[in-house]
Amino acid sequence: MPYDKKPKMILFDVGGTLFAGGNFSARNGLAALRLAALNPQDTTDDKLALLWDEYSEKIGGGHKSPFGVTLDFPLSGALRYITMNAGLRFDISVAEQEEIFDRYNSDRKVIKGVTELLKTIHSLSIRAAIISNNAMSSEGLGLAIKHWIPEENMEFYLTSSDILLTKPCADIFTTAANYAHLNPADCWYCGDSKRPDVDGAIGAGMTPILLDVNSSAPYEYRTDADREYLVINHWNELTQHLKKHF
């Protein structure tokens, strides 16, 4: 089994994997961003919310490449459109603006077991990184993860908006492996969704681990189209697996 071979790197999804979030509110995120501007008095939260809706309507969603790959649009584009049209000025980077918007647009908590898992990975000299279907830039997402998990030790962050391509497209996985100078076979990928995370990782040659918090079995193997993959219902299970085998 590939799970008995020590990986050189373990990569993670973000939403539903590292964090559990509540309902999304663009208005709340934009309100916090307005207060971070040098001239917050020049516009209102209502104006920013209207600009968000206007931009979203113009851009639309579900865009695909000629090869059928769903494409992502960067959050930075939306924030620039909104804040510039509102006349807001900042003395912080766009990545910092992304992080503020992200921090306040929903309730969020770190999923149980994540911090201990990351400490264990680091103690075993296994490298760690992020691959996420995320509108944030890698720089913005890195700031966000560092805010919620100060002790995180990710080597790098790769988001779909960085390269436009989204999971389960194999290219986003192989891009990360190439950047790490690793063979995909030496990498594990952890996520909470079957198609983008498990199917995507397998398609790229990585070893997937699925977090299914609704599973009654703490640790099991599932098979799909003759492909077996590990499923756990708590990150503590992976922590114990790593400590036991490596």
Identify what each model region corresponds to.
Residues M1-F12, A20-G22, L38-D46, K109, ...:
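Asp-based, Mg2+/Mn2+-dependent phosphohydrolase catalytic module
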Residues Y3-L124, S138:
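N-terminal helical cap/lid subdomain that shapes the substrate entry/recognition surface
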